[in-house]
A protein has these predicted regions:
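Short, surface-exposed loop/turn segments at beta-strand-coil junctions that are enriched for proline
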Residues: 110-115
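A short beta-strand micro-motif common to beta-rich folds, especially ectodomain repeats
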Residues: 118-126
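Surface-exposed binding patches on compact interaction domains or structured appendages
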Residues: 73-101
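Post-signal-peptide N-terminal segment of Sec-exported extracytoplasmic proteins
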Residues: 36-77, 125-138, 143
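Short, low-complexity, disordered segments immediately C-terminal to signal peptides
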Residues: 19-35
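Short strand-edge motifs at loop-to-beta-strand transitions and within beta-strands
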Residues: 51, 101-107
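C-terminal motif of bacterial Sec signal peptides marking the signal peptidase cleavage site
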Residues: 14-17
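Positively charged n-region of N-terminal signal peptides that target proteins for export
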Residues: 1-4
Length: 146
């Protein structure tokens, strides 16, 4: 019986030590991936993050260019831009924005079927660190007289 317990303890110790090595390898792999991501990142400075379009009439469209500058040393790649509502359509630059260059994300808000206070958010995915801030359109839509 003692022999059986001793064998179980030895096997348990071996299994636990293998698991520690596995966790170390996983941690090392994660660290390498993080270092690679950080090598490929850049920084961005937003010239404007909020646009207040005032009061418009239902059915009007608002178009605005949110401007930004790549302040890092690597090209800024915007992989995705999407809005909180289908009535708002962002258009991102198709080409990378080189260091020192200024560019914009064009946003069009269609007020058809909308009324009252409007707050639309635009979310941008890029290789910027810290991440690209959310963009916001604010305003009022007056309902058409029926």
């Amino acid at each position: 019986m003692i022999r059986y317990i001793l064998i179980c303890l030895i096997l348990g110790t071996l299994l636990l030590s293998c698991d520690v090595r596995r966790k170390d390898k996983v941690a090392d792999d994660a660290m390498q991936k993080m270092e690679q991501v950080l090598k490929d990142t850049t920084t961005v400075e937003l010239i404007d993050t909020v646009y207040k379009f005032g009061t418009i009439t239902e059915g009007d469209k608002v178009e605005y260019n949110f401007r930004f500058k790549n302040t890092g040393k690597k090209p800024l790649v915007i992989s995705n831009a999407h809005a909180s509502c289908g009535c708002t359509v962002p258009e991102k630059p198709e080409k990378p924005v080189m260091p020192g260059e200024t560019s914009f994300i064009k946003v069009v808000f269609n007020s058809k079927g909308k009324s009252g206070h409007q707050e639309k958010s635009i979310f941008v995915s890029s290789n910027a660190r810290p991440s690209f801030p959310d963009l916001t359109l604010l305003g009022e839509v007056k309902r058409l007289a029926q």
